[in-house]
Amino acid sequence: MEGFFQRYLSLYRSLITTLNELLSAYELSYSLWQVIYHIKTNGPSTLVDISARYNVEKPTITRRVHRLEELQMVKQIPGKDRREKVIQLTELGDKIYQECRKKITDLEHSVMEGIAKDEQKAAFHILPKIQENLFNREGNKSE
């Protein structure tokens, strides 16, 4: 289906812009939110864990974590290895997560209005398959 990527990228840009506007009240961007979301969902995490989850270079995640530390939303705790940096949410980070999660959930519900539940489920299941196909294609290229 030609034009799918263009449509998807247009939606993605609009969504990121909307999320950045929503999160700006907390001095956050979507990229910072991803770190908070990962830690809340997976518990204390290393920089490597977070960078692998989002397929982002470790130095990029390091900069995001430093910004969140400045905002007092995350802190480093000792890891198994002293070279390993483990990041966890602070009380403030958890509070902000709860507030933002509610707003993001409300946004999800509002943008899905008028779309049948079966169509929502189809999109929910199709997107990870596309991501997997892309990952497999990239993986096959390097072999």
Pin down the residues of each PLM region:
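N-terminal leader segment of winged-helix/HTH proteins
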Residues: M1-Y26, M73, K95
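Short capping segments at the starts of secondary-structure elements
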Residues: N42-T46
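The alpha-helix within a helix-turn-helix
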Residues: S51
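C-terminal regulatory/oligomerization modules of transcriptional regulators
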Residues: D118-E143
